[in-house]
């Protein structure tokens, strides 16, 4: 093989690896975005039910807690523990 062919093959392999890494990062960010949207919808639903009935929905709070624990993220609301 000529050096030009070898360098072309190496360039294609490097480009494929870079593409896989970029798409993997994009997929992870997209999944994080979907999880955050789901959490936001649950928070909105809890707020609406609390306004309507005067108390919060236990099922929605449990689902929200499970999502927050599953994602390993802190609570999406602000907590001031000063």
UniProtKB/Swiss-Prot annotation:
It is a single-pass type I membrane protein. Phosphorylated by host CK2. This phosphorylation is necessary for interaction with human BTRC and degradation of CD4. Keywords: AIDS, Apoptosis, Host membrane, Host-virus interaction, Inhibition of host innate immune response by virus, Inhibition of host tetherin by virus, Ion channel, Ion transport, Membrane, Phosphoprotein, Transmembrane, Transmembrane helix, Transport, Viral immunoevasion. Residues 29-82 are cytoplasmic. GO terms for biological process: receptor catabolic process; symbiont-mediated suppression of host innate immune response; symbiont-mediated suppression of host type I interferon-mediated signaling pathway; symbiont-mediated-mediated suppression of host tetherin activity; viral release from host cell. Its main location: host cell. Pfam families: Vpu (PF00558). InterPro entries: Vpu, Vpu_cyt_dom_sf. It is found in: Host membrane. The modification Phosphoserine is found at residues 53, 57. Ion channel activity is inhibited by hexamethylene amiloride in vitro. SUPFAM superfamilies: HIV-1 VPU cytoplasmic domain. Gene3D superfamilies: HIV-1 VPU cytoplasmic domain. The chain crosses the membrane at residues 8-28. One of its GO terms (cellular component) is host cell membrane. GO terms for molecular function: CD4 receptor binding; monoatomic cation channel activity. Residues 1-7 are extracellular. The N-terminus and transmembrane domains are required for self-oligomerization and proper virion budding, whereas the cytoplasmic domain is required for CD4 degradation. The cytoplasmic domain is composed of 2 amphipathic alpha helix that form a U-shape. HIV-1 lineages are divided in three main groups, M (for Major), O (for Outlier), and N (for New, or Non-M, Non-O). The vast majority of strains found worldwide belong to the group M. Group O seems to be endemic to and largely confined to Cameroon and neighboring countries in West Central Africa, where these viruses represent a small minority of HIV-1 strains. The group N is represented by a limited number of isolates from Cameroonian persons. The group M is further subdivided in 9 clades or subtypes (A to D, F to H, J and K). Belongs to the HIV-1 VPU protein family. Homopentamer. Interacts with host CD4 and BRTC; these interactions induce proteasomal degradation of CD4. Interacts with host BST2; this interaction leads to the degradation of host BST2. Interacts with host FBXW11. Interacts with host AP1M1; this interaction plays a role in the mistrafficking and subsequent degradation of host BST2. Interacts with host RANBP2; this interaction allows Vpu to down-regulate host BLM sumoylation. This is Protein Vpu. It comes from Human immunodeficiency virus type 1 group M subtype B (isolate BRVA). The lineage of its organism: Viruses, Riboviria, Pararnavirae, Artverviricota, Revtraviricetes. The gene is vpu.
């Amino acid at each position: 093989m000529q050096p030009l062919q070898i360098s072309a093959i190496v360039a294609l392999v490097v480009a494929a690896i870079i593409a896989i890494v970029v798409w993997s990062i994009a997929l992870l960010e997209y999944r994080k975005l979907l999880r955050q949207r789901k959490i936001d919808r649950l928070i909105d639903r809890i707020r609406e039910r609390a306004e309507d009935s005067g108390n919060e929905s236990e099922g929605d709070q449990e689902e929200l807690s499970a999502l927050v624990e599953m994602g390993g993220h802190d609570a999406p609301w602000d907590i001031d523990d000063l």
